[in-house]
């Protein structure tokens, strides 16, 4: 057995942990962005509807 070879199991475990953390981070960010985007979209839609209604009269 070569002594230079790094232990595979801890590296594999670290890789899995890292990917899990990255996935969780991305999911949280996308959820927050989606919620704020939906809120802003509702706000803009409401104001735009009011503006078009005022200008149509």
From Swiss-Prot:
Topology within the bilayer: Single-pass membrane protein
Entry keywords, A to Z: Host cell membrane, Host membrane, Host-virus interaction, Inhibition of host NF-kappa-B by virus, Membrane, Transmembrane, Transmembrane helix, Virion
Residue numbers on the Virion surface membrane side: 1-8
Primary location recorded for the protein, binned into one broad class: virion
Cited InterPro entries: SH
Annotated transmembrane regions: 9-29
Residues on Intravirion side: 30-57
Keyword ATP-binding: no
GO biological process: symbiont-mediated suppression of host NF-kappaB cascade
A GO term from the CC aspect: host cell plasma membrane
Coiled-coil regions, chain positions: none
Keyword Cell cycle among UniProt keywords: no
Subcellular location: Virion membrane; Host cell membrane
Family membership: Belongs to the rubulavirus small hydrophobic protein family.
Quaternary structure (record): Interacts with host TNFRSF1A, RIPK1 and IRAK1; these interactions interfere with host NF-kappa-B activation at the level of receptor complexes. Interacts with host protein UBQLN4.
Function, as annotated: Plays a role in the inhibition of the host NF-kappa-B pathway. This inhibition occurs at the receptor level, by preventing the signaling of TNFR1 as well as IL-1R and TLR3.
Name used for this protein in its record: Small hydrophobic protein
């Amino acid at each position: 057995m070569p002594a230079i070879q790094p232990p595979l199991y801890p590296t594999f475990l670290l890789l899995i942990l890292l990917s899990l953390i990255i996935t969780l981070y991305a999911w949280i960010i996308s959820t927050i962005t989606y919620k704020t985007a939906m809120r802003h979209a509702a706000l803009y839609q409401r104001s735009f509807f009011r503006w078009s209604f005022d200008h149509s009269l």
